[in-house]
Regions:
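Aromatic-lined carbohydrate-binding/catalytic grooves of carbohydrate-active enzymes
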Residues: 324-464, 474
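Short Pro-Gly-centered flexible turn/kink motifs
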Residues: 91, 98-105, 282-301
Length: 653
């Protein structure tokens, strides 16, 4: 049994292959956190210490005991209004404006299998691979019931957490803050590792000592963002790649998020991850339930490499659902850097001919095939084929490409609309904007309100009408701006659920299409997206040297098989740097591998080198994608970037 309950001590113990997680319902009914770390068979309630500390108040139920305070005790799910003045996981406001919820234990259930979340991506597993613990806490006066969900995947050494918030009262309540996970550490001196960046330079590792106070980061952009990835590592100060304690949290969500790390007045550490409380105020009527997206937690006593391996296994085996997750994927060439908007059907066919001669498996027609789109100023929202530009129907073009012996892929950006489009002229209210105000433009486009079903249905029907015209093998889903015009506190969350609904319908209808996520490169590179698409374009920056840093940071949580990586032309279109074709090829092989250039401009020698690159990649592709990935150097600290893939059987490298 991975989950054990001791009824005498009221201790819950969650066991994985190498870790133990423990919590206890105390005599007053509060759920206290005891331990998370290396595997143990001991009860850890001895870690709880009680002391009378000035200005740390005491629950009324504690009577005259001034040593009992929620301001100092480690808690499993702390709330506002209980005398805990640290950062909290949950804040709920009632109709009178009062913000106070005191959660006490009511019941629990242990069951085989992994819980699922309605409308949200989550780790999945068979009944013999996982167990679920559901603990019900409640505040009858506030009319709130909270269900803490724990999924234990023993073999992966991961524990997942999510929360259901139920309005059990007769009035309305408003959720002002909702995190999925809280980890209170009584002892230890920690560093916080986060992954910051910008467009075309995502997921740079930054390690900071956690001093007193709060270190926080997140996104308010409507997506998980280029700027901060929804992932964090809490590590002992001497932890390295191959030694030392470290804890990871990874948010399975593609929208606004928040991570808070706090060292309190008595040197205890609290780590929180969940939904951002900025631009968030979610109304919940009587009888309704709100679901907080999932956090995947993992612990390693053997440094960052082992922690990464645990996350890589979890994501590839229990997050990605696509049939392509463990298949050989096609080496593709994308038309974007080869032609940008300036192409015809003949251009794509010529690209296919060149690709076939090089051993490339697939040609992808990027932005510019629909509406009247010859630049980025028009036609988003008008998903009909520009047959004049292509010189025929899409079906005819697909057949011509397939006739060259290569597969066919296409680019879409379903969440966006241009003001210069038929869709916007007919439905201007479908674009997200604050009533009475002019919207914020970005890349000359607005965001469609995917929180509305009629909007999603219209775009879905348009996209399906395109996909049904021929055998499309691959789709690149892009999303090229941040959300600015947030007109309501529920919009950002409901928008993401709308995107997930659209994606679920799409992959269900077209299970044989390989879907690759993208948001200006890696602006939505998260576990939520990987639930629907087994790979994501890692960055719009294809410079080989910069990519070593981007892919290095990405590898701390995400497997190589998820990283879209291509060989591009030189001078590089983003940086102007010139690197050898060999260097570009090696870097791209630490990902899904493909090309982003015009092969007609290559010399015969370069073409022959590409043929050899593709042969090499195909020889080692399954080893790279399915093997164990090791970071050998840090491109941020060392003069060289080096990595290694080792087979699961440890007989190849």
């Amino acid at each position: 049994m991975a989950i054990i309950f001791n009824p005498n001590k009221k201790i819950f113990t969650l066991q994985t292959a190498h870790t133990t997680y423990q919590m206890q319902v105390d005599r007053l009914g509060y759920l206290l956190h005891l331990y998370y770390g290396a595997k143990s068979t001991c009860d850890m309630d001895y870690v709880l210490t009680y002391a009378d500390r000035g200005f740390s108040g005491n629950p009324y139920a504690a009577g005259m005991n001034r040593t009992y305070s929620l301001d100092t005790l480690p808690q499993e799910y702390p709330t506002l209004g209980t005398g805990d003045f640290r950062n909290i996981a949950l804040d709920i406001k009632n109709e009178q404006g009062t913000e106070s919820v005191e959660l006490l234990y009511k019941s629990h259930e242990i069951r085989d299998g992994k819980y699922a979340l309605k409308g949200l991506p989550a780790v999945w597993a068979s009944d013999d691979e996982a167990q679920t613990l559901e603990i019900v806490l409640g505040d009858d006066i506030a009319g709130v019931e909270v269900h803490l969900l724990y999924g234990v995947l023993e073999a992966c050494d991961v524990i997942t957490r999510s929360v259901l918030i139920k309005n059990t009262g007769s009035g309305n309540i408003t959720i002002e803050k909702a995190h999925a996970a809280c980890l209170d550490m009584v002892y230890g001196d920690y560093d916080v590792i986060r992954f910051y960046g910008k467009h075309a330079m995502e997921r740079n590792l930054e390690r900071t000592h956690l001093g007193h106070g709060t270190l926080s980061f997140g996104s308010r952009r409507g997506t998980s963002s280029h700027q901060y990835n929804p992932a964090v590592i809490l590590a002992q100060r001497d932890t390295t790649e191959n030694a030392g304690d470290c804890y990871g949290m990874l948010f399975v969500y593609s929208g606004n998020f928040s991570c808070e790390a706090e060292k309190d007045q008595i040197n205890q550490t609290r780590l929180l991850m969940g939904l951002s409380d900025e631009l968030f105020s979610y109304p919940l009527a009587a009888g309704e339930t709100f679901t907080v997206p999932e956090v995947i937690m993992s612990y390693s006593a053997d440094g960052f490499s082992q922690l990464s391996h645990q996350y890589h296994t979890c994501i590839s085996e229990h997050v990605c659902r696509s049939r392509f997750a463990h298949e050989v994927r096609p080496v593709l060439i994308n038309s974007w850097e080869a032609a940008y908007f300036d192409f015809t059907g003949d251009t794509i066919v010529d690209l296919a001919k060149e690709a076939a001669s090089l051993g490339i498996d697939m040609v992808v027609m990027d932005d510019g095939w629909f509406g009247k789109r010859d630049d980025d100023n028009s036609s988003l929202g008008d998903w009909f084929v520009n047959e004049k530009k292509l010189g025929g129907t899409l079906s005819e073009l697909i057949d011509r490409v397939h006739a060259q012996g290569v597969k066919f892929g296409i680019w879409i950006e379903p969440e966006m609309v241009n003001e210069d489009s038929n869709l916007y002229r007919e439905h201007p209210d479908w674009a997200i904007q604050i009533p009475g105000k002019l919207p914020v433009r970005s890349r000359n486009q607005l965001i469609l309100d995917f929180s509305r079903k009629e909007v999603r249905d219209n775009i879905f029907d348009q996209i399906c009408a395109v996909f049904d015209q021929g055998k499309i093998d691959y789709v690149k889903w892009d999303m090229n701006r941040s959300m600015a015009d947030v007109y309501a506190g529920n919009l950002a969350y409901d928008y993401v659920l709308g995107v997930y609904d659209f994606m679920e319908r799409l992959v269900t209808r077209y299970p044989d299409i390989l879907l690759e996520g993208c948001s200006g490169g890696g602006g939505r590179f998260d576990a939520g997206m990987l639930y629907y698409s087994p790979q994501i374009w890692c960055s719009d920056n294809t410079d080989a040297i910069n990519r070593t840093r981007i892919q290095y940071g990405t590898s701390f949580f995400y497997p190589v098989s998820s990283m879209g990586a291509h060989v591009s032309a030189v001078p590089n279109h983003q940086t102007g740097r010139v690197t050898s074709l060999k260097t570009r090829g090696i870097t791209a092989m630490a990902g899904t591998f493909g090309y982003e250039l015009n092969p007609a401009l290559l010399s015969d020698e370069e073409k022959e080198e590409i043929r050899e690159q593709i042969k090499t990649f195909k020889k080692y592709e399954m080893l790279i994608n399915e093997g164990t990935y090791w970071r050998l150097t840090s491109p941020f600290e060392d003069e060289v970037a080096a990595w290694m893939s080792v087979s699961r059987a440890k007989d190849r490298a």
